[in-house]
């Protein structure tokens, strides 16, 4: 029994190391593609890629799903990156003094996209789910790193706002990713 546990742990560590290495390489490629050099941008996009990998892995239940997961990952990758970027567009629009505007640092843009695509467009659902994962990762990273949302009083409410909205971004269209036409999370 102890040998089986050690073998399982070794396999888990190797899998994690390979996945993390892959995430670093993909992150570097995405940053190069969009000409990004900021350390903050690199952090946000790496966290987004790692969360996207975990999100897809958790949804790939059957062997057929596992084979399809690679395609879903690459299809959702660029929208995921856009999700990691979107909250910081408030800097461009309102300057740094308006950064962490609650409209940009929320799930509002995600649910607007969900509403616009409807429930029947599986391809678009994959893109929007990727965006939602990227947005969720940005919001959750801000909980750990900054957490100061404009116009909300105190650090606890700010972090609660970011955390809840990050969670909401992982709902909706992703419930049917990598699954047949059935429903459920």
What are the roles of these predicted feature ranges?
Residues 1-185:
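N-terminal membrane-targeting hydrophobic helices
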């Amino acid at each position: 029994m102890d040998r089986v546990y050690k073998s399982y742990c070794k396999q888990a560590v190797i899998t994690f190391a390979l996945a993390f290495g892959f995430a670093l390489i993909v992150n570097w490629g995405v940053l190069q593609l969009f000409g990004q050099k900021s350390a903050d941008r690199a952090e946000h996009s790496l966290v987004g890629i790692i969360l996207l990998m975990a999100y897809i892995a958790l949804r790939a239940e059957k062997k057929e799903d596992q084979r399809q997961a690679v395609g879903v990952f690459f299809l959702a990758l660029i929208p995921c990156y856009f999700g990691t970027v979107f909250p910081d567009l408030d800097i461009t629009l309102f300057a740094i003094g308006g950064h962490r505007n609650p409209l940009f640092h929320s799930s509002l843009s995600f649910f607007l996209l969900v509403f616009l695509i409807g429930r029947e467009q599986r391809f678009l659902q994959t893109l929007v789910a990727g965006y939602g994962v990227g947005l969720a990762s940005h919001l959750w990273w801000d909980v750990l790193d900054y957490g100061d949302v404009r116009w909300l009083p105190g650090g606890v409410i700010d972090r609660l706002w970011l955390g809840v909205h990050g969670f909401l971004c992982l709902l909706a269209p992703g419930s049917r990713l990598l699954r047949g036409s059935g429903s459920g999370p």
